[in-house]
C-alpha cells in the first residue's frame, strides 16, 4: 500500500470528490481523501492524503488557507460567483482605491459570516444548494471565521458600469471567499460578486509546487513516486515537540507522557519522524493517534 501526502493542483470544472475519484484510478488505491473542499470553478491547491496518511487529514482540513482571486463590483449573482444568474445591478462609474483598501482592511480579524445558499453546508440533513435549486430559502447559522489578510493586488479597472480588481486573502477554515466579496460590495454600497478564485496555499502546501492529475499519472506510469510527500507534511500546522526514545516507547503502547507545552494538541516527533498526535490531559499528554505503527 502506498502512503503519503499529495499537493494536487485542482483544475476548473471538477469537484474535490471528482479529483479523489480520479486519483483512486490513477494510483489503484481506495484509501484516499482530501483536506478541504474546493468549489468546481475554483482552482489551485487541494491537499490529498493517501493510505496511512488519511489519519492526519483532519489536521490538514483545519489549517489556514490563502487564496487569490478577482472581485467584480457592479452586479451580484445567485451563487455569489460568476456561475450564477444576475440578481442585482448597481452601475459604477468611479471607485477610489484608497476607499476599497480601507474597506478590505476592516474585514481583517474575527468576523461573522452566513454561508451562501449555494453551498454544501447541511441544514436538517439537506445541503443548502439543494434547497437553493428547489427555490427554497432557509435560515442559515452564522459562523465565526478569521481573516488574517485581505488586500487588493491590482489597479481597479472600470468598464461597462463595473469595477474589477484582483485580491489576496489569508483566512481560517470555513471562510466563504464568495461571501467576503459580496460583503465588501455591501460595505462600499454596491452589488458585487467573486469573479475568479484559486487557492495558492493550504496546510503548508503551495501552488508553485503542486502537480496536476495528468502530471501525477505520467509519473505513476514512469514508476516515479516522488509526488508522494511524507506524512509529516500533513501535521506541519500542528505545534511540533521532540520526545525521547523512552517516551517513544510509551507512546507506542498508548501511554501518557509529560511534554513541556500548553498546546491542546501537538505532533510528537523522534528526530524528523512523526510518532503521534498527542492530546493534553491535565498536566500530561495522551496519544490521540499513533502514526508510527
UniProtKB/Swiss-Prot annotation:
The keyword Isomerase applies. It comes from the Bacteria. It holds the Pfam family TruB_C_2. It catalyses: uridine(55) in tRNA = pseudouridine(55) in tRNA. It is an enzyme of class 5 (isomerase). Keywords: Isomerase, tRNA processing. GO terms for biological process: mRNA pseudouridine synthesis; tRNA pseudouridine synthesis. One of its GO terms (molecular function) is tRNA pseudouridine(55) synthase activity. The active site is at 39 (nucleophile). Its EC number is 5.4.99.25. Responsible for synthesis of pseudouridine from uracil-55 in the psi GC loop of transfer RNAs. Belongs to the pseudouridine synthase TruB family. Type 1 subfamily. PANTHER family: PSEUDOURIDYLATE SYNTHASE TRUB1 (PTHR13767:SF2), TRNA-PSEUDOURIDINE SYNTHASE (PTHR13767). This is tRNA pseudouridine synthase B.
Amino acid at each position: 500500500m502506498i502512503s503519503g501526502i499529495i499537493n494536487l493542483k485542482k483544475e476548473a470544472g471538477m469537484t474535490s470528490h471528482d479529483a479523489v475519484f480520479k486519483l483512486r484510478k490513477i494510483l489503484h488505491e481506495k484509501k484516499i481523501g482530501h483536506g478541504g473542499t474546493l468549489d468546481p470553478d475554483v482552482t489551485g491547491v487541494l491537499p490529498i492524503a493517501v493510505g496511512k496518511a488519511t489519519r492526519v487529514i483532519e489536521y490538514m482540513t483545519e489549517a489556514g488557507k490563502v487564496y487569490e482571486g478577482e472581485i467584480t463590483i457592479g452586479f451580484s449573482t445567485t451563487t455569489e460567483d460568476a456561475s450564477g444568474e444576475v440578481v442585482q445591478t448597481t452601475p459604477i462609474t468611479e471607485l477610489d482605491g484608497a476607499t476599497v483598501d480601507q474597506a478590505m482592511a476592516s474585514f481583517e480579524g474575527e468576523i461573522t459570516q452566513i454561508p451562501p445558499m449555494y453551498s454544501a453546508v447541511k441544514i436538517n440533513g439537506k445541503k443548502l444548494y439543494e434547497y437553493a435549486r428547489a427555490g427554497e430559502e432557509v435560515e442559515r447559522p452564522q459562523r465565526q471565521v478569521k481573516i488574517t489578510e485581505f488586500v487588493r493586488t491590482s489597479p481597479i479597472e472600470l468598464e461597462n458600469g463595473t469595477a474589477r480588481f484582483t485580491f489576496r486573502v489569508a483566512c481560517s477554515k470555513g471562510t466563504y471567499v464568495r461571501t467576503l466579496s459580496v460583503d465588501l460590495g455591501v460595505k462600499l454600497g454596491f452589488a458585487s460578486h467573486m469573479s475568479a478564485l484559486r487557492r495558492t496555499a493550504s496546510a503548508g502546501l503551495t501552488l508553485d509546487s503542486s502537480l496536476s492529475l495528468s502530471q501525477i499519472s505520467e509519473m505513476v506510469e514512469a514508476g516515479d513516486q516522488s509526488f508522494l510527500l511524507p506524512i509529516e507534511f500533513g501535521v506541519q500546522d500542528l505545534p511540533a515537540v521532540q520526545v525521547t526514545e523512552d517516551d517513544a516507547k510509551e507512546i507506542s503502547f498508548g501511554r501518557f507522557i509529560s511534554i513541556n507545552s500548553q498546546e491542546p494538541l501537538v505532533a510528537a516527533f523522534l528526530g524528523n519522524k512523526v510518532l503521534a498526535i498527542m492530546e493534553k490531559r491535565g498536566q500530561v499528554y495522551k496519544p490521540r493517534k499513533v502514526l508510527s505503527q
